[in-house]
């Protein structure tokens, strides 16, 4: 079982000719809503990868909650661990200009109310894979890492978005997944040694005994374990929208580990899923199905 403890949002997206200046009103051409939040996105990706998934998080008692959870429900994700709170459902207000530039305001809402006490709803047990991100209170992420270890579960921590104080508990996770920017920032916070990123990844893995995975967008993915270094190339694609690629990677990676794939195979499968997610607009709607990912993997080999 994969247990995702994380954020659930509804994204409110306005397409505008150009981004407004303070005090200015600009015209828009389209408005859409879409379920989001790193936790929910990753839970759906793990489910589409073929895993059984339980989501632990919170939404509001408002009209946004049902839509925020709609695709998770369709994907047969167990939502028994999702609380209803008096806070609003988490929202991201997004304006996208014709040139692709955007501005985003994220209001955590109910996500900020996910406290360590809620972790009892995860029902952690030996062999589970616990998937975490930094969009809920960091004290809850820290507590989840401790409780998962005590239960004998495997932990995957996606260090997004970057939060400096998260550097203090990175080494509690069995697998740390970061993008280039995040890893470089954590590397500074942790004073990692090495002339380049790969060397600093080796330094982290060697010091902590953990496995660190760094996604490189179009350049693929690198991973360092205490004893080896892996690099997996990316498929060549022309991206339409990269918004859900990182979350898709994380969900597929956790599902692949849970199903017993070796690290290199898990990285290749997650990388293929992440690249396919770039071929459609949106985060959750773009997450590919397992059959499409496995077909893409066969085509590359």
Per-region residue spans from a language model:
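Conserved beta-alpha-beta core of the PfkB/ribokinase-like small-molecule kinase fold
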Residues: 129-199, 219-221
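Conserved phosphate-binding/catalytic loop of the ribokinase/pfkB sugar-kinase fold
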Residues: 58, 82-84, 94-129, 134
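Short gly/ser/thr-rich secondary-structure transition/capping motifs
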Residues: 76, 109-115, 155-161
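A short, aliphatic-rich alpha-helical micro-motif
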Residues: 124-125, 170-171, 206
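Conserved phosphate-binding/catalytic region of the ribokinase-like
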Residues: 164-167, 189, 194-301
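Glycine-rich phosphate/adenosyl-contacting loop at the front of the ribokinase-like
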Residues: 1-58, 63-70, 74, 238-240
């Amino acid at each position: 079982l994969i247990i995702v403890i994380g954020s659930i949002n509804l994204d409110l997206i306005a397409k505008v000719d150009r981004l407004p200046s303070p005090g200015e009103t600009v015209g828009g051409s389209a408005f859409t809503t879409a379920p989001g939040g790193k936790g929910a996105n990753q839970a759906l990706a793990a489910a589409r990868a073929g895993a059984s998934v339980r989501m632990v998080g919170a939404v509001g008692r408002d009209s946004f909650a049902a839509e925020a959870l709609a695709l998770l429900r369709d994907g047969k994700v167990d939502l028994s661990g999702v609380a209803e709170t008096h806070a609003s459902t988490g929202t991201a207000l997004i304006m996208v200009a014709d040139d692709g530039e955007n501005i985003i305001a994220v209001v955590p809402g109910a996500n900020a109310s996910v406290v360590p006490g809620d972790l009892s709803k995860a029902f952690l047990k030996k062999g589970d894979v616990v998937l975490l991100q930094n969009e809920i209170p960091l004290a809850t992420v820290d507590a989840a890492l401790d409780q998962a270890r005590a239960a004998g579960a495997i932990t995957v921590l996606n260090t997004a978005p970057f939060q400096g104080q998260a550097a203090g508990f990175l080494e509690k996770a069995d697998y740390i997944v970061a993008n280039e920017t995040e890893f470089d920032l954590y590397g500074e916070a942790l004073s990692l040694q090495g002339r380049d990123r790969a060397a600093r990844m080796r330094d982290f893995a060697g010091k902590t005994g953990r496995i660190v995975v760094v996604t490189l967008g179009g350049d693929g993915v690198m991973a360092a374990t205490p004893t080896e270094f892996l690099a997996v190339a990316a498929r060549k694609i022309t991206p339409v929208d990269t918004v859900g690629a990182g979350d898709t990677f994380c969900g597929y990676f956790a599902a692949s580990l849970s199903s017993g794939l070796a690290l290199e195979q898990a990285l290749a499968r997650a990388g293929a899923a992440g690249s396919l997610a770039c071929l459609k607009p949106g985060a959750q709607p773009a997450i590919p199905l397992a059959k499409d990912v496995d077909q893409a993997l066969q085509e590359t080999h």
